[in-house]
Amino acid sequence: DEGRMALDEPLGFDWFPRARSPETDPRNEITLRHVLNMSSGLETVDNGGLEYATGSGLAYWAGPSSIRGARARALIREPGTFWDYENYDTLLGVYAMKLAIGDDQEYLEFPRKRLLDKIGMRSTLLSTDRFGDFIMSSQVYTNARDLGRFGLLYLNNGMWNGERLISEEWIDFVRTPAPATATTGNGYGGQWWLPGDNASGVPTDAYSTSGNRGQYTIVVPSHDLVIVRRGLDNPGGFSRWGLLREVLKAIPEETEDR
């Protein structure tokens, strides 16, 4: 939103292992849009059950650099054509932000100064790996009140107390189905989850974050509604859209004054 990054420009990274001719490395075609849509085309690591063996999970426990690991995957598909949920794709987006900011201290202060403090998310901690890089694919410690503030910012189209913190274009991006999900139900946008084609009885404009073990922030503009749910679930043990359906049942439908 500050004009430092563009969704459709190549990331411009140095990749590992280095190609004999880096300028012709096919990974150079990967854009910020691709990684935020979870469709980089890079090899599967986390989603293949290897998160804590060779994937992003190693960085959680003072292991290798999260960013170097994210840049060390081979390209196995054309970017933008196949959806695969990978923490490493998010970490590539974080690295792109670091390069765009260009100053380590500003990078570390950026989330709090430009977002968290402005909306009062004072109980939220964004962890880094041991090299000082944010692990924004995970390791974000927060509480329900802060998540509610985050959801309210999106419900208000990026405005907070009269100040625009997030552009409407960004909000449109995060709640637009990733092109690569067209064949699998359109259930994912830009780092946010969507009801998709198969969630009956759910407003089509709803969208939701999803944290480990059932941490959800659901935004429903058509009902002026934000729902925060905290949990400690086993994988697949809770339906955020089922929760939304039950909440909507409890809200009386508006009727015209007579």
Please describe what each predicted stretch is.
Residues 7, 11, 15, 28-32, ...:
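Stable alpha-helical elements in mature extracytoplasmic
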Residues 50-73, 79:
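Amphipathic alpha-helical interface segments
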Residues 23-26, 77-86, 135-141, 209-216, ...:
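Solvent-exposed loop and edge beta-strand segments that line ligand/cofactor-binding
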Residues 2-42, 72-75, 102-138:
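Active-site helix/loop module of the DD-peptidase/beta-lactamase fold
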Residues 206-258:
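Structured C-terminal helix/loop/strand segments within mature extracytoplasmic catalytic/sensor domains
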Residues 111-112, 116-176:
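Active-site-proximal binding-pocket segments
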Residues 121-128, 171-226:
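Active-site Gly/Thr loop motif
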Residues 1-4, 35, 70, 84-115, ...:
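Alpha-helical scaffold elements that line and support the substrate/ligand-binding pocket
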